[in-house]
Amino acid sequence: MALQQTLLITGASSGFGRALAQAALAAGHRVVGTVRSAQARQEFEALGAGAIGRVLDVTDVEAIPGLVAELEATVGPLDVLVNNAGYGHEGILEESPLDALRRQLDVNVVGAVAMMQAVLPSMRQRRRGHIVNITSMGGFITMPGIAYYCGSKFALEGISEALGQEVAALGIHVTAVAPGSFRTDWAGRSMVRTPRSIADYDALLDPIRDARQAKSGRQRGDPAKAAQAMLALIEAPAPPAHLLLGSDALALVRDKLDRLKADIAAWEAVSRSTDA
């Protein structure tokens, strides 16, 4: 068995967070999971002796430093932070209120950054640690109707990569994990949908929305297998800066990169024309 580590996983009540917690506990690690209610905390701690629950809303950024300090004092050093808390927003950009964008960024980006800032001092002092940010293939590719969500995941991908460069010499690893479509509740009850109002977009979005809802719960990706992949990542001595999960993510991101390379080549002369 790999050396026992203590993981702090946000959003541990369901989806990837719960699957990773179960896999890590089975592998002999300790897991602190943040959840949104006292009942969810009880359910999480029932997973096993190594499961430690805490109630936290990641948008309450002022509460995060105190929580991390309390955990370090009572549980011990936190070896791995997994920023998993998040949700998806679906809506045409023109129809979606700015408050929906602010909420999306508060949960998916600001909360994750606050968690990173809270664990970094101890990791930096110990010259050891691993931060894993669960992003999405939507942090590399885009599709109509999830502009706010993709924007939040593009942001977290960039933040993860830049932070990794800042802390690499300090013994701290940062990995952005980008899953494809998995059998989680992302497209189900956890997704926030802005009501439709502009008929011009019906032909574009309605089929996409219908297909997404029809596929929910039947996606190819298996959360339990994703958890094993993330566990291997956490236990790796030299983890990557980016990790895609799922054959769909591989295919779609490779296609995006090919199209990006083609655009760069087609417009290379214009790009170079701006040099003095």
State what each model feature region is.
Residues 13-14:
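Conserved glycine-rich cofactor-binding loop
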Residues 92-93, 97-102:
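Substrate-binding pocket helix/loop in short-chain dehydrogenase/reductase
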Residues 116, 152:
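Active-site helix of classical SDR
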